[in-house]
Each structure stands twice: as structure tokens, then as C-alpha cells.
């Protein structure tokens, strides 16, 4: 049983987050180890394993990147944890330029405003890449979807670096 089947959801990238959360709470309630406190040792162990599976599946599906990676792994294209280099020089150049721009923000005359504008730009890029990924997954274009996930991970890491810089400004 895959993660989508566990939550009785269609195998597709776009998910109803509310339904996912509702199904998660229901499964958590049903398989919570406390419900099996008086059960046999075997049943208690199975409930702990099931609860762990439910938690893992929920964490995977609620995050768009891990959800896409999971979908690819279900198509025998497991890219989780891979160290493959992206072969898109234009995208890589864009990422280098964005990182340079991020490094220069601290020296701007109004760094908070510059960071806000930069964050808006990166958020738009993230949403655009997410939309492209969804299309590729819907078309079962697994190879291109894998590259889209790799790109999305670059952008997501940049978003994390923006958050870290924000913390230094507002702490």
C-alpha cells in the first residue's frame, strides 16, 4: 500500500491539504498505540509500526518536494538523496546570480526592503517551478519531472537561506 492509498487519496501531485490532515488525524486516532495497550505484544508492535508508517507518509505527502520525490520513486525513479548534478547551465547560472544577489543584500542601503523584494522574486520562481513540476507529473513525464524536482530543491534551499538572513535582520 503506497502513501496515497493509505490516506485514500488519488495518486496525483495536487492534494487537498485539508483532506490529507483529516485523514491523518483519523488514522492516527485509529492506530494510536494507546488503543492497543491491553492487546497482545504482536498487536502492540503492529500498532507502533502502523503509527510510524502513518506519520512518515503524512510528512512525505504534506511537503511538495518530498511528495514529488515519492511519486517518482513509485515509478522506479528514486531521486531522494541523490547527488546528481543538474545539466541545465542556464538554470545553474541563474542560481549563481541569485545567490550573489542574496550575498549583496546585507550591503544594500535598505537591506530589509531589498530582502523583501528578493524574497518576492524567489517565491515567484518557486511557484512557477512548482506549477511546471505539477504539469510534468500529470503528464507522466517522469524524467523531466525529476529534473524539475532537482531545480525546485535548489530554489527551496535558496528560500531557506533567505529565512536565515531574515533572522539576522529581525533578531
From Swiss-Prot:
One Gene Ontology MF term: ATPase activator activity
Described function: Co-chaperone involved in the maturation of iron-sulfur cluster-containing proteins. Seems to help targeting proteins to be folded toward HscA.
Subunit field text: Interacts with HscA and stimulates its ATPase activity.
Annotated GO biological process: [2Fe-2S] cluster assembly; protein complex oligomerization; protein folding
Alphabetical UniProt keywords: Chaperone
Domain of life: Bacteria
UniProt family annotation: Belongs to the HscB family.
Protein name as annotated: Co-chaperone protein HscB homolog
Gene Ontology CC: one annotated term: iron-sulfur cluster transfer complex
Residue span(s) of domain J: 2-74
InterPro entries: DnaJ_domain, HscB, HscB_C_sf, HscB_oligo_C, J_dom_sf
Pfam families assigned: HSCB_C (PF07743)
PANTHER family: IRON-SULFUR CLUSTER CO-CHAPERONE PROTEIN HSCB
Amino acid at each position: 500500500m503506497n502513501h496515497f492509498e493509505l490516506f485514500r487519496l488519488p495518486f496525483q501531485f495536487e492534494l487537498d491539504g485539508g483532506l490529507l490532515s483529516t485523514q491523518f488525524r483519523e488514522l492516527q486516532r485509529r492506530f494510536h498505540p494507546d488503543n492497543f495497550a491491553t492487546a497482545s505484544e504482536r498487536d502492540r508492535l503492529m500498532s507502533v509500526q502502523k503509527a510510524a508508517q502513518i506519520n512518515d507518509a503524512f510528512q512525505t505527502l504534506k511537503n511538495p518536494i518530498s511528495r514529488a520525490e515519492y511519486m517518482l520513486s513509485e515509478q522506479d525513479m528514486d531521486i531522494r538523496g541523490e547527488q546528481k548534478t543538474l545539466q541545465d547551465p542556464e538554470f545553474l547560472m541563474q542560481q549563481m546570480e541569485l545567490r550573489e544577489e542574496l550575498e549583496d543584500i546585507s550591503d544594500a542601503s535598505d537591506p530589509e526592503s531589498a530582502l523583501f523584494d528578493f524574497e518576492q522574486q524567489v517565491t515567484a520562481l518557486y511557484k512557477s517551478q512548482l506549477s511546471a513540476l505539477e504539469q510534468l507529473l500529470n503528464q507522466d513525464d517522469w524524467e523531466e519531472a525529476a529534473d524539475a524536482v532537482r531545480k525546485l530543491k535548489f530554489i527551496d534551499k535558496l528560500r531557506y537561506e533567505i529565512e536565515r538572513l531574515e533572522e539576522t535582520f529581525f533578531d
